[in-house]
C-alpha cells in the first residue's frame, strides 16, 4: 500500500514532531528540578540536608536551628551560673558550724591579733569556727552577705548568736577591761561555755 504524502500529512508530521520536542524539554527540565532538590550528605554528619539547608522533617533552616539551640544553651548556662552560688545559703550553712563564728582574712594583722587573743586567753566548748574569707571561692559575694546581715563588712568580725559582737578593737577593749569573759557568757546564752586561761595575756 503506497503512502501518499500531501500537505495535510506533512502538517500532521510537523505538529507531531513539535509536540515530541516540547514533551522532551518538559521532561528534561523536570528531571533537572528533581536533581536540584536531591538531598546532600554533609561529611562527618549523620543528617542529610537539601539545597535550602533544611534537614528532613524540619521546617526551618538547620543554621537557624543551631543558632536557636546555641541561644538556649547560653540561657541555661547563664541561669546555671546565677544559681551556682547562693550567698545567703552559704552564710546560713556557716552559722550552723558553731555558736561562735569568726570571719577573718589570713593577711589581715587585726585578724591575726584577734585569733591569737582568743587562742591564748580563752577556752571555748564547743570551739568557735573561723572562716578565712580570702580563701573562700566567693569572697566578695559572701562578704556582701555578711555586711547585709550583720551591718559589718570589715574583718575580723565575731558573730555570736547571729549578731556581730565587733572586731578586734571592740573585743580587745573588753578583754583589757576584764569584761570579755562575762560578755562571752552573756552572748552565748548557754550555747557554749568559755573560761579564761590561767596564763591570760592582754593584747
UniProtKB/Swiss-Prot annotation:
<dbReference type="GO" id="GO:0000324">
    <property type="term" value="C:fungal-type vacuole"/>
</dbReference>
<dbReference type="InterPro" id="IPR014025">
    <property type="entry name" value="Glutaredoxin_subgr"/>
</dbReference>
<dbReference type="GO" id="GO:0005801">
    <property type="term" value="C:cis-Golgi network"/>
</dbReference>
<dbReference type="GO" id="GO:0005737">
    <property type="term" value="C:cytoplasm"/>
</dbReference>
<dbReference type="GO" id="GO:0016226">
    <property type="term" value="P:iron-sulfur cluster assembly"/>
</dbReference>
<dbReference type="Pfam" id="PF00462">
    <property type="entry name" value="Glutaredoxin"/>
</dbReference>
<feature type="signal peptide">
    <location>
        <begin position="1"/>
        <end position="32"/>
    </location>
</feature>
<dbReference type="GO" id="GO:0046872">
    <property type="term" value="F:metal ion binding"/>
</dbReference>
<dbReference type="GO" id="GO:0015038">
    <property type="term" value="F:glutathione disulfide oxidoreductase activity"/>
</dbReference>
<dbReference type="InterPro" id="IPR011899">
    <property type="entry name" value="Glutaredoxin_euk/vir"/>
</dbReference>
<keyword id="KW-0732">Signal</keyword>
<dbReference type="GO" id="GO:0005794">
    <property type="term" value="C:Golgi apparatus"/>
</dbReference>
<keyword id="KW-0001">2Fe-2S</keyword>
<dbReference type="GO" id="GO:0004362">
    <property type="term" value="F:glutathione-disulfide reductase (NADPH) activity"/>
</dbReference>
<feature type="binding site">
    <location>
        <position position="108"/>
    </location>
    <ligand>
        <name>[2Fe-2S] cluster</name>
    </ligand>
</feature>
<feature type="domain" description="Glutaredoxin">
    <location>
        <begin position="88"/>
        <end position="191"/>
    </location>
</feature>
<dbReference type="GO" id="GO:0006879">
    <property type="term" value="P:intracellular iron ion homeostasis"/>
</dbReference>
<dbReference type="GO" id="GO:0005634">
    <property type="term" value="C:nucleus"/>
</dbReference>
<keyword id="KW-0479">Metal-binding</keyword>
<protein>
    <recommendedName>
        <fullName>Monothiol glutaredoxin-7</fullName>
    </recommendedName>
</protein>
<dbReference type="GO" id="GO:0005796">
    <property type="term" value="C:Golgi lumen"/>
</dbReference>
<dbReference type="GO" id="GO:0016020">
    <property type="term" value="C:membrane"/>
</dbReference>
<dbReference type="InterPro" id="IPR036249">
    <property type="entry name" value="Thioredoxin-like_sf"/>
</dbReference>
<dbReference type="GO" id="GO:1990229">
    <property type="term" value="C:iron-sulfur cluster assembly complex"/>
</dbReference>
<dbReference type="GO" id="GO:0034599">
    <property type="term" value="P:cellular response to oxidative stress"/>
</dbReference>
<dbReference type="InterPro" id="IPR002109">
    <property type="entry name" value="Glutaredoxin"/>
</dbReference>
<keyword id="KW-0408">Iron</keyword>
<comment type="similarity">
    <text>Belongs to the glutaredoxin family. Monothiol subfamily.</text>
</comment>
<keyword id="KW-0411">Iron-sulfur</keyword>
<dbReference type="GO" id="GO:0051537">
    <property type="term" value="F:2 iron, 2 sulfur cluster binding"/>
</dbReference>
Amino acid at each position: 500500500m503506497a503512502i501518499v504524502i500531501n500537505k495535510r500529512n506533512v502538517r500532521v508530521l510537523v505538529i507531531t514532531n513539535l509536540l515530541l520536542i516540547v514533551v522532551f524539554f518538559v521532561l528534561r527540565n523536570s528531571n533537572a528540578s528533581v536533581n536540584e532538590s536531591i538531598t546532600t550528605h554533609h561529611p562527618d554528619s549523620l543528617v542529610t540536608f537539601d539545597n535550602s539547608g533544611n534537614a528532613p522533617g524540619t521546617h526551618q533552616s538547620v543554621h537557624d536551628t543551631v543558632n536557636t539551640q546555641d541561644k538556649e544553651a547560653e540561657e541555661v548556662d547563664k541561669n546555671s551560673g546565677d544559681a551556682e552560688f547562693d550567698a545567703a545559703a552559704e552564710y546560713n550553712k556557716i552559722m550552723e558550724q558553731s555558736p561562735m563564728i569568726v570571719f577573718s582574712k589570713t593577711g589581715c594583722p587585726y585578724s591575726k591579733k584577734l585569733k591569737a587573743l582568743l587562742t591564748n586567753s580563752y577556752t571555748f566548748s564547743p570551739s568557735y569556727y573561723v572562716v578565712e574569707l580570702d580563701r573562700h571561692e566567693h569572697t566578695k559575694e559572701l562578704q556582701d552577705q555578711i555586711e547585709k546581715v550583720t551591718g559589718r563588712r570589715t574583718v575580723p568580725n565575731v558573730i555570736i548568736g547571729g549578731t556581730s559582737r565587733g572586731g578586734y578593737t571592740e573585743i580587745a577593749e573588753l578583754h583589757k577591761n576584764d569584761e570579755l569573759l562575762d560578755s562571752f557568757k552573756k552572748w552565748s546564752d548557754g550555747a557554749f561555755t568559755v573560761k579564761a586561761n590561767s596564763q591570760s595575756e592582754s593584747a
